């Protein structure tokens, strides 16, 4: 069976891993890095992904960052006259990770397990699946990020019964989950979080501080200067990382702006204490969901066996200290927080292919599901934190006499009134026979599969007439749209490859022009002038084709010139050999004459053995 890769599709960084020899391994990208920034940029009709896109994020307006925040919405971004959905942008990142995996494994990859925040609703999960399909991947399973972390951690802990808190503070989202591990079974008991909180926010408080300090000193607002803002963002991220290891760091940005008299420089010492003061509110915001998850699980902090940290932002000392204070447990640091989710996804891939045995993953639905009933009330059929896959049915009736149809309004959320929750979809069950209010029996069934995707059906028990819906919210893509996007993604991949080949062809042609000039110069006066003229003419024809940018013409003229240059090079080589032979003969004769006139004998002493 072909390998199933595990992908952590993150808000700020993504990571891909695979099972090798029974162990999950992170696959490095072409630059040799183990994580890839989730950034896509468009420049001169070329797509850039990762570090190269991130480096010019602020200066290039056609750069898309943190697109994961928009998954499951109808958000679109227009780039160079074309509209892109969050699924398409995510697919570009997934294509990049897929290509890294294929280069590493030396085989085509078509299947993946992709992780999502535990708090992702149905629309967001469906959008993630669609992104995988557009990228040419069969998404075998969508799993929650904290669950994936527990899977990676739990490989060597399958025989221990434990209650684990997974504290996942990534670049753009925060999740906390409580899991139970026993006999190779991972069960998520509860989950909570904030999908608008992450490492980006910690960077931003440093940027705001730098902007405020510079404005105080120079009365210039750097936040209005895109070039300066890019440098501030890079410096803030570096300072944040530095302060995880040292107690103070120097931020030095020369020529950050122009003053009336001369250029202005930003020089500032940032201490860990100041950073903790600036970010105290952000750290505090992670604790409320932590308390809520514990409460939902019916546990006190003292009942936890282990606290696992996930996400690069958990390296911040204040974050580690806060979770230690809150739980009374020293956070476990035996897993790389940047990679553990991808490793867990790879383990789940191994479970699905049969490479990993004895592991059962029981995930939960993060939000309650139900329908709108009389008076706009939200009636829950499946409570949040219910283990999935699951199915639940409930019988309802009509609200008016002789009601011919019922509208089924499917919702997700925790508020008591329908208007305050998120609509997942609507459908209608018609042709209900006339009957007094309350008599018809309408059975509504909710099914949630292992990916957290919802199917709802309504059945009139009197007539057995049935109507069903697979939830496709406003952001969901139809099969036709996904197919179109898959074709576009493939076409773009082909276009990117073609563009690369074009660049290589032009480079080869330029190199040949340079080589021809050199050969012609070396052969001047040594070969027939007609041959030199022929080479010069072919070279000029190639230069003209390069200027016109006619690729087929470049290829033809390049091949023609290549042949002429090869013939000339052979002649040059033959002449060099002949010249070397003559020189050798002359040198030999000279050496022989010199031998007679000036013979130098080595001194030696003959030693005779005594007989």
Swiss-Prot record:
Gene3D superfamilies with a match to the protein in the record: 1.20.1270.10, 3.30.420.40, Actin, Chain A, domain 4 (3.90.640.10), Substrate Binding Domain Of DNAk, Chain A, domain 1 (2.60.34.10)
Keywords, sorted A to Z: ATP-binding, Chaperone, Nucleotide-binding, Phosphoprotein, Stress response
Biased composition (Low complexity): 579-592
Positions of post-translational Phosphothreonine modification: 173
Record InterPro entries: ATPase_NBD, Chaperone_DnaK, Heat_shock_70_CS, HSP70_C_sf, HSP70_peptide-bd_sf, Hsp_70_fam
Entry keyword annotation includes Ubl conjugation: no
Region described as Disordered: 579-598
CDD domains linked: ASKHA_NBD_HSP70_DnaK-like
Triggers of expression: By stress conditions e.g. heat shock.
Family classification: Belongs to the heat shock protein 70 family.
PANTHER family named in the record: HEAT SHOCK PROTEIN 70KDA
Name of the molecule in the record: Chaperone protein DnaK
Biological classification of the source: Bacteria, Bacillati, Bacillota, Bacilli, Bacillales
